[in-house]
Amino acid sequence: MVKLRLKRCGRKQRAVYRIVAIDVRSRREGRDLRKVGFYDPIKNQTYLNVPAILYFLEKGAQPTGTVQDILKKAEVFKELGPNQTKFN
């Protein structure tokens, strides 16, 4: 099973996160399938590769809680079909 989750980057006390598609059994810093976004909580900046995110969501990937909140704020779920909005 694939999840969309955050992968920590940056230095000490200045964390930034990559949003990655990763296998459930991998650890947080493990090898990802694909990088699909970027999130900086300090500057409150977000970059999302929406076509890649939609591809993984259509294939059955489950976003974690934090990633789901980021995607809701960016209104990514509105681009999914009405039969695939099980994340709202």
Curated annotation (Swiss-Prot):
GO MF: structural constituent of ribosome
Subcellular location: Plastid, Chloroplast
Keyword Lipid biosynthesis applies: no
Annotated keywords: Chloroplast, Plastid, Ribonucleoprotein, Ribosomal protein
Main location: plastid
GO cellular component annotations of the record: chloroplast; ribonucleoprotein complex; ribosome
Pfam families, alphabetized: Ribosomal_S16
UniProt GO BP: translation
Origin superkingdom: Eukaryota
InterPro entries: Ribosomal_bS16, Ribosomal_bS16_CS, Ribosomal_bS16_dom_sf
Record-stated family: Belongs to the bacterial ribosomal protein bS16 family.
UniProt xrefs under HAMAP family: Ribosomal_bS16 (MF_00385)
Protein name: Small ribosomal subunit protein bS16c
Native species: Helianthus annuus (Common sunflower)
Classification of source organism: Eukaryota, Viridiplantae, Streptophyta, Embryophyta, Tracheophyta
